[in-house]
Amino acid sequence: MPIRHCIVHLIDKKPDGSPAVLHARDSELAASDAIENLLADLNDSYNAKQGKAWGFFHGESGAYPLSGWLKQYLEGEKDFTAFSRVAVEHLQKLMEESNLSTGGHILFAHYQQGMTEYLAIALLHHSEGVAVNAELDVTPSRHLDLGQLHLAARINLSEWKNNQNSKQYISFIKGKNGKKVSDYFRDFIGCQEGVDGPGETRTLLKAFSDFVESEDLPEESAREKTQTLVEYATTQTKLGEPVTLEELSSLIDEDRPKAFYDHIRNKDYGLSPEIPADKRTLNQFRRFTGRAEGLSISFEAHLLGDKVEYDEAAGTLIIKGLPTTLVDQLKRRKD
């Protein structure tokens, strides 16, 4: 993963309405194994995050200036350090307006994966831990906690430059606690949502279910194709890449590689050629789950019609091949 440029700044702020103090770095970080490892770990953590949203830049304005500064950098009017400096100063102002925001280290990284260039911007925090030193003493230790990555965005620079009509060249982590916590970061990026990842994924799965039904496939074949879809889509989410409908179609049916793709187009599901799959929605498709008072049921989707039978009229499930541990518990209760 070639890293073109990388820099870190610090915004010191507590979530109590106090002023945000900027500690800006004057030069880029020199290339090192540590930087490469940090970016690799950040990518892995970001790709694994659920609840991301996809979108595109607002028109450049005083409220959303980042895209203009980024364009100046890419066209050589600003160097990377100058771009990151004006950007982090803007973020500092937005943080001060958001009382509940917390400061941290702001990472800017321009890097390349394959033929695609990206800009990653992330707010990083430290965690306190312990370590054993060379004298075998236990000492306090601080490290960047990438597992607690709550505010980050990734801009596909290649897509932005080469596809003016794209509405999904920016991805960002969507906060769970609403506007007060995370919207200031989205406003900093200047991003408006263009693609509903969970909604697009649900539509894709609906199209697939309709396709399987229309093909009247044997149960084993339907199960294999379902597994192929879920595995491919899950792999793409781990890589931070979209699901490509034509590629998915060729994987689902190697003998008729366009069959599923043509089904989607002919039925007009409204899906884009590439969609950002939502991991949580995929997991729901992989398993059926349900809870009621004192009862929890979960089983893999492909077991329906085999080991699990559903009677809609009676509202019952018949489960065959019970787990041995469950059978033993039931026997002990009976005795």
Curated annotation (Swiss-Prot):
Domain of life: Bacteria
Record's keyword terms, sorted: Cytoplasm
Statement: the UniProt record of this protein carries the keyword Protein biosynthesis: no
UniProt GO MF annotations: double-stranded DNA binding; single-stranded RNA binding
Subcellular location: Cytoplasm, Nucleoid
UniProt xrefs under Pfam families: NA37
GO cellular component, one term: cytoplasm
Membrane spanning stretches: none
Disulfide bonds: none
Keyword Cytoplasm: yes
Family: Belongs to the YejK family.
NCBIfam families for the chain: PRK00378.1
Name listed for the protein in its UniProt record: Nucleoid-associated protein Pput_1012
Organism field: Pseudomonas putida (strain ATCC 700007 / DSM 6899 / JCM 31910 / BCRC 17059 / LMG 24140 / F1)
Lineage, opening ranks: Bacteria, Pseudomonadati, Pseudomonadota, Gammaproteobacteria, Pseudomonadales
